[in-house]
């Protein structure tokens, strides 16, 4: 059994597709089909077997999943999370991070004072957006770029942004 610390979320089943038990898979890998090159597991560490049927214009994958053969079975998988083992992932270049490693990191201002944390990292197709939860419990969304986040480390993130009063 694997702890969630040893797993990286690489995809989620969005919905069923058609009547043969196919599922629509949102892959978090780049390119999306890279997910198929990994040993995939669920939260409990059980192996998952996925076979690509096709890819739509949004980059979502239409796949067969384990032994699912009917639409009814596939409908029960909506929201199902797919992981791979952290140890199986390639070494990252400098200034590259896995989303799982950035989520919940403290955010510091230019004076290195903690002002919040990364709540989530989102992508709606035009680039990564960082959702910040500030110390006063308010949240804001900012694009993930060097202008707003000039320094990102494995331990903290520096934010170059003045909030409106």
Swiss-Prot record:
Species of origin reads: Rickettsia massiliae (strain Mtu5)
What GO molecular functions are on record for this protein? ribosome binding
Binding partners and assembly: Binds ribosomal protein uS19.
Q: Which family does it belong to?
A: Belongs to the RimM family.
Describe the function of this protein: An accessory protein needed during the final step in the assembly of 30S ribosomal subunit, possibly for assembly of the head region. Essential for efficient processing of 16S rRNA. May be needed both before and after RbfA during the maturation of 16S rRNA. It has affinity for free ribosomal 30S subunits but not for 70S ribosomes.
InterPro entries from the UniProt entry: PRC-brl_dom, PRC_barrel-like_sf, RimM, RimM_N, RimM_N_sf, Transl_B-barrel_sf
| Localization in the cell | Cytoplasm
Q: Name one GO biological process term.
A: ribosomal small subunit biogenesis
One matching Pfam family, short form? RimM
- Which controlled-vocabulary keywords does the entry list? Chaperone, Cytoplasm, Ribosome biogenesis, rRNA processing
Q: Cite the NCBIfam families for this sequence.
A: 16S_RimM
Q: Where is the PRC barrel domain?
A: 94-165
Q: What is known of its domains?
A: The PRC barrel domain binds ribosomal protein uS19.
Its protein name is: Ribosome maturation factor RimM
Q: Name one GO cellular component term.
A: cytoplasm
